[in-house]
Curated annotation (Swiss-Prot):
The protein's name in its UniProt record: DNA gyrase subunit B
Record EC number: 5.6.2.2
MF (Gene Ontology): ATP binding; DNA binding; DNA negative supercoiling activity; metal ion binding
Residues the UniProt record annotates as site (Interaction with DNA): 486, 489
Other comment: Few gyrases are as efficient as E.coli at forming negative supercoils. Not all organisms have 2 type II topoisomerases; in organisms with a single type II topoisomerase this enzyme also has to decatenate newly replicated chromosomes.
Catalytic activities: ATP-dependent breakage, passage and rejoining of double-stranded DNA
Amino acid sequence: MAAQKKKAQDEYGASAITVLEGLEAVRKRPGMYIGSTGERGLHHLIWEVVDNSVDEAMAGYADRVDVRILDDGSVEVADNGRGIPVAMHATGAPTVDVVMTQLHAGGKFGGENSGYNVSGGLHGVGVSVVNALSTRLEVNIARDGYEWSQYYDHAVPGTLKQGEATKRTGTTIRFWADPDIFETTEYDFETVARRLQEMAFLNKGLTINLTDERVTNEEVVDEVVSDTADAPKSAQEKAAESAAPHKVKHRTFHYPGGLVDFVKHINRTKNPIHQSIIDFGGKGPGHEVEIAMQWNGGYSESVHTFANTINTHEGGTHEEGFRSALTSVVNKYAKDKKLLKDKDPNLTGDDIREGLAAVISVKVSEPQFEGQTKTKLGNTEVKSFVQKVCNEQLTHWFEANPADAKVIVNKAVSSAQARIAARKARELVRRKSATDLGGLPGKLADCRSTDPRKSELYVVEGDSAGGSAKSGRDSMFQAILPLRGKIINVEKARIDRVLKNTEVQAIITALGTGIHDEFDITKLRYHKIVLMADADVDGQHISTLLLTLLFRFMRPLIEHGHVFLAQPPLYKLKWQRSDPEFAYSDRERDGLLEAGLKAGKKINKDDGIQRYKGLGEMDAKELWETTMDPTVRVLRQVTLDDAAAADELFSILMGEDVDARRSFITRNAKDVRFLDV
C-alpha cells in the first residue's frame, strides 16, 4: 500500500478544506458530538483520530497506524499517510490550524475534489472535536519535504514550526483529554484493542500497532494477533528486552485475509459445517461491498455490518439487501435441487441464518447514517446494489459447491422444523398477555404504575429472595419476577426447547416485547430490567444465563440500555450504638472499618462484619436499603459497544467448546471486574 502511495498531494491540500464553524459549541455540549462524557465518550476521542488515519489507508496512501496509550494520560496516534496540509488556507491561517480548530473542516466536505472518495471518520470534524475536548494537543507532520510541528493549549493554536528536511510523510497526533469535561480519563486497553482489531479486519493488509506504556514490568504482554506471527526471538534479543528499563503491553493487528480472517475469528470457538469461507465483493458507481460468511453448528446468528468501517450496530439497507438475497437464493436452490418439496412452505430468513457468521462491509461515497450515533445505514440505493451482488455471487457459489450447499440447506430445513414445532409454544407465550399472566400464578408481582418509562422489573433468583424483594419493594413502580426453576442455556438449545422452558416463558410474557423477528420494543412494559442474583459464583452463572437469553432473543433491550445488573452488598458492618453500614467490595469494607474506628466507633465483637452468602439472607428492609432504593442503590448498565466481542464471549462461556471456556477462565481468572457486554 505504502509503496503505491499516489502522487496526488495537491488534491488533499489547503483548497480541500471547507470551514463551517468553530469549536465553542463542542465544549458546551460534548455529548452531541461524542455521545457522552463517560468512558464511551472518552474512547470516542481515540476512534476519531484513528478513523482519520484509516481514511488515508482506505484511499491508498498509508499502510500503518501506531496507537500508544502513554503514562501521562495522553494518547498518540501516528500514520504514514500524506500528512495534514500545512499550506496557507484561504482564511489566512495554516490549513492544519483550520483542520484542528474549525468544526466540519474535513477534506471530505469539499465534494468531488475533496481528499477522499470514501471516508469513515469525520475527517477534520473528529480531530477538531478532539482538540476542543483536550487540555493540550500536539501534531507533528511530515509533508512537503519537511517536518512540521504545532501544539494547541485548550484548542488555542501555537505557532506552526518548520523543522528538518525529510523524505517521509505522515501525521502524529497526541492529545490529553480534559478531566474537567470527562468523568474519567482512564483508557481501557481491551476496549481499544478490540476496536483496532476490528479496523484491521476491515482494511486488508493494514498494520495497526497498539502499545500501552502505563503497565509495570510485571504486566508484560507481547502478543501478535496475526496469521503470520513474528519469528521466535533469539536469546540475545530476549536478554536485551529484559535489560530494557521499561516494558510495555503491545499488540499488532494485521490480517492479509481481511474479512475472511474476521469470520475465522468469529467462528474460532464454534464448529463450522463447511470448510471454505464464502468470500465475494462487488463495485458500482459510488458503492463497494465485500462479504465473508460461513455457517457453524450453533443456533445463533452472528451477522456484523459496517459502512465505511463504521460499525452499524442497528444494521440498515446493506444488511436488508444481504438478507433479502440470501433468503431468495437459498429457497430457489433448495426447490431446484429438490431439497425442499414444491408444496413445502419457503424457509424463513431466521431458518437460513441459524448458525451463520457473516461480515458485511460496504463503502459508500455519500453515506446517510440514521441517528446522531451513526449506527444505521439509510442509503436506499445500497439495498438494491448489495442485493444484486449477493444474488449473483451466492447463486454462483451454491451451484459451484453442491456438497456444502446441501449441508447448509439441510441445516435450514432442520431449523424450520424446529420453528414449526416451537409455534405452539410461542403462541402459548404470546396468548399469555402482559396483563393476564395465565399459567403463571403467584410469580409476577406487578407494579401499580402503567407507565413503562417509570416501571422496573426485578428478575430475582430464588423464592426466598423473591419474597424479600416483594415485601421490600416500592410497589408503585417496582415489579418482581422470582425465578424458581433453572433457566435453560439458550446457547445449547434450539428455539422449540427454549420456549418450552417455564422460566423463559415467564420472562418473555412479563416483558411483553416478543422475540426475534416479532420483537417490538414499543410493547416493552418496563424500561428498567434489573437482574438480581447472589454475588457468588452460582449467582453470576444465573446472571450469565439470563444475559445470554436476552442477547440471543431480545438483543434490542440491551442495545437500547434497558438491562441492568443489581449490585447487592457483600458485607454488613454492625456498629455498637450506630446504624449499620454496607460494603460492596473488600476494599470498601476495609475503608469503612478504618474510617469508623478512627471516628471512635466500636464494632460488635462476635458478628461485627457479616458476609452475605445470598440475597435470601437479607430481610426486606435491608434489600430495599442496599439494592432496590433508587436513591442509594448501585445498578450496572449492560452495554453492547462491541457485538462481535459479546457474541464471542457468550459462545465461549455458554457454548460446547470446553477447552475454549477453560482457556478463557484461566486467562481472565485474575480479572474479577464484570465484563460489560
